[in-house]
């Protein structure tokens, strides 16, 4: 037993050793490529120092850890300082462990931090340089850290050309950051090709610099092609995320379901997209008021939703949220931005209206209507003056007769109960109503509260009044047989006093009786026939005969009722044939139908029985009757009946035996249509129709109009033609022609004048040059043709208007004609001119223009021009020697 104990302990130790070895080997992972990061000697906390390509080492890693607590590594390989770090001259390194829990594998990456120093290397052309065989003058990838801490100038990389193996090469660069803005950010050592940066760079301003590197010999020869040299600026998380709005305003309906979307907040980050620097997370920092959390925000989308249905506007109507957004996927070292979100809780119909009390009382006087009797207040916690607060009232019970109406006062939200139909105290002394109320808007869904219609009881007390008689029912009916004897008495209209429920003491009067057939007994209200009642006279037939009755009590209060008299029919009218005269066209028509009617009720009417009474043998031999239906019979003739008019007696009898005989005139005519024989069937004289009378009247009127026209024409021909009065009528005649006239020689005396030689031969002067007494005068003009006018007939001087009235002037159709105006003015102006041409002794005056007749061409007298009319001396010398009384006048006239 003692030996067994040591054996078990040795065996356990061996197993433990093997287990530890297995764990060590399982945890030992494959080492990936070492990464070297150039960093400054002093590192600030929470600053990125570089990025490691973790996917190249281990793509499926789901756990990333750092062996050095001073540094932390993110999922994208970014390496950050956890605290401020100062590097010594020695190199510092740490390991990044990458693990895959499912595959139970692990890899590690060694990160070496080197303190960067300025590189100063001088290389001569002859110096032997060890190179890789495949190195060529080609673009070299290069990058620099944003907001780098230096030291500056910061070495970026070395540029080498293949031509440097054979020549002494000098390097230079150009592009943005060198000779373009920002100037002098980069420079290159001319001999070595070392590229440096002189100051920090903001990636948000410049994310890449496209430089061009040149290699040339001492004599300016381009030893190689220009090299594109892009320098990419690595992003640093130096920009805080910013919300798009400083204050967001959202609304949410109260009692909303959990998960209801309230709104969306959004933030932006100026750092490089699709990196951890711009991977944002949203959260709620604070809610005011600090009630249980009612809202949540999606960390990635920023969608704010409700998490509870206890949003109650009547408790809290507005919430304020402080929203936070953080980059670096929400890790604690990410940068933060905040904003305020105001959420207003809008009203929903989640509060039912309630009555303040369960029962109400109201009073109303009987016979009153359209009066308000009660106001019912309502309590509702919803938002005032909205559909959720306004209510509708309903009378659920007690208003079967429609006496009441309830409405809502829009201002106070009270129920207004009114009486719209009079109440009768004797019938209903008290009315019980059940009133219900609900909101205009429907109740909100899914709310855990009772939404049944609230109810209240209203008791309406009717107050009694001493009112007049009542005519109830308003229309009463009575039956009377027609042809009842005058003076017959029948029960009439009955009214009653509601106070004693009988009609004692009431008086009755008749207000309206269409035919005057009835009188009313004032005391009893019975009706008495004053005329024979004929049902067939009343129009329309079979209608009730209505009489309006007035009932009056002792206080002269009254009511009005209608007594409807139903006149019962008796068989007092025999059937009657409608036709008086018929035409039968022989041989086209072999018969005619005879129709009969009976104004009595159908029970006293059809079927009718038609027959030919005992008549002459000729009628019985030539004519016969056969039944067609209950109201018609067919009258047929024999073939040997002659063409003439027959008078045939026909007897018609109804079902009760009432009969009547009528003489029917039948014209048996040779025709094709009955209208062809109607004119000859009349035994009386011809009667003119309305159109014939109208035609006669129009003919007479036309004859009178023709005679009147002839008479007016005769009187118009015998009446002398008058010359018009002076057409100018004391108005100015337009005469504004200022151009020279025609170049012609005309007589100065274009009017009817007396010649200077006092010739006794009369003439009508014209504008011509020749004259013929008593005949035609030829007028010769310089332009135009010849024009003939018939001169005034008769000798003597034509000085007056009447001298030419008896003449008849004929003017050729193709000649010029004078107007009436010219004919009227010519003799008058000629007479005026002739008188002015004479002195007191009626001799030609020397102070006037003398008239000379044209004597033909070649006259030794020559032509009389305008200058011949002017005297040799003006005779104005007397103005130079005025008398004293005229000197003052002359001086006044000569002043300007």
Swiss-Prot record:
CDD domains: Cadherin_repeat (cd11304)
Domain of life per record: Eukaryota
Tissue: Expressed throughout the basal and spinous layer of the epidermis with weak expression in the granular layer (at protein level). Also expressed in the buccal mucosa, esophagus and cervix (at protein level).
Record field: transmembrane: 691-711
Major place of residence: membrane
Induction per the UniProt record: Induced in the hours following cyclic mechanical strain in keratinocytes.
One term under GO cellular component: extracellular region
Disease / disorder: Hypotrichosis and recurrent skin vesicles: A disorder characterized by hypotrichosis and the appearance of recurrent skin vesicle formation. Affected individuals show sparse and fragile hair on scalp, as well as absent eyebrows and eyelashes. Vesicles filled with thin, watery fluid are observed on the scalp and skin of most of the body. Mucosal vesicles are absent.
Protein name, as recorded: Desmocollin-3
Record organism: Homo sapiens
